[in-house]
A protein has these predicted regions:
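Membrane-embedded alpha-helical segments of integral membrane proteins
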Residues: 21-36, 137-198
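Perimembrane loop-to-helix junctions flanking transmembrane segments
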Residues: 85-102
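Membrane-embedded alpha-helical segments in integral membrane proteins
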Residues: 16-28, 44, 89-93
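Structural signal for the C-terminal ends of transmembrane alpha-helices
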Residues: 44-53, 123-127, 185-194
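Functionalized membrane-embedded alpha-helices
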Residues: 58-78, 104-145
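N-terminal membrane topogenic signal
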Residues: 2-15, 53-62
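Central hydrophobic cores of alpha-helical transmembrane segments in multi-pass inner-membrane proteins
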Residues: 37-49, 114-121
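Internal/C-terminal transmembrane anchor helices
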Residues: 197-206
Length: 206
């Protein structure tokens, strides 16, 4: 390996390790902290700046970590769909859309199913280009919603991980910023992703 190749490898793994370590640091920042927020945003900038340093192995690790988080989130909420429905009702009240109350349980099942399906597709590497796009869109929505939660506090708890892991609104926003690090690593390399299974196999797995 050349010196430049070694530098790319070190840089890529360093960015991933820093992101994982930052997830641990979230426990110490339960409210707004400008320094920590800038630190997380800087990581996102670095992902764009050094997007070419991520090897296939690094992309795989990022994909598996992201898939595991989606599966965990979908599972812990899925075991208590009514609890998730109550959280959704809180949002309906906060945004003045009380007339949607009747659909809270439906959206609870839909959200949990979407996270479980996307998590499984990430782990199993099914339709990687489509999956990376859908995950990017979902995380974009989640990030905007949790930014509003952090700034305006319309609900006390988004219930992102059900009752298994209670986070403040700012911690939830920080968490989503870090997840976006993994999302970008996967999404920015979607054109170079090779499918592992033919269409019939993917359909059978699904």
């Amino acid at each position: 390996m050349t010196q430049q190749s070694n530098l790319k490898t070190v840089t890529g793994w360093a960015l991933i390790i820093v992101a994982v370590f930052s997830a641990y640091l979230i426990k110490f920042f339960d409210d707004f902290n400008l320094a920590f927020l800038l630190f997380l945003l800087f990581q996102l900038v670095l992902i764009f700046r050094y997007k070419n340093v991520f090897s296939p192995g690094m992309r795989t690790v990022s994909r598996l970590l992201l898939g595991a988080v989606f599966l965990y989130s979908g599972f812990v909420k899925g075991v208590d769909p009514m609890g998730t429905a109550y959280r959704i009702e809180d949002y309906f009240v906060a945004f003045g859309t009380d007339w949607l109350m009747f659909s809270a349980l439906f959206f609870s099942f839909l959200l949990n199913a979407a996270e479980l399906v996307l998590g499984g597709m990430l782990i199993l590497h099914i339709k990687p280009k489509l999956t990376s796009l859908l995950v990017l869109l979902m995380m974009g929505v989640f990030t905007l919603v949790t930014l509003n939660d952090a700034l305006n506090n319309p609900v006390p708890d988004c219930g992102c991980f059900g009752d298994a892991l209670i986070l403040t609104n700012w911690q939830t926003f920080y968490k989503n910023l870090l997840l976006n690090v993994l999302v970008l690593i996967v999404f920015l390399h979607r054109k170079s992703i090779r499918r592992l299974y033919p269409d019939k196999t993917e359909l059978a797995i699904g």
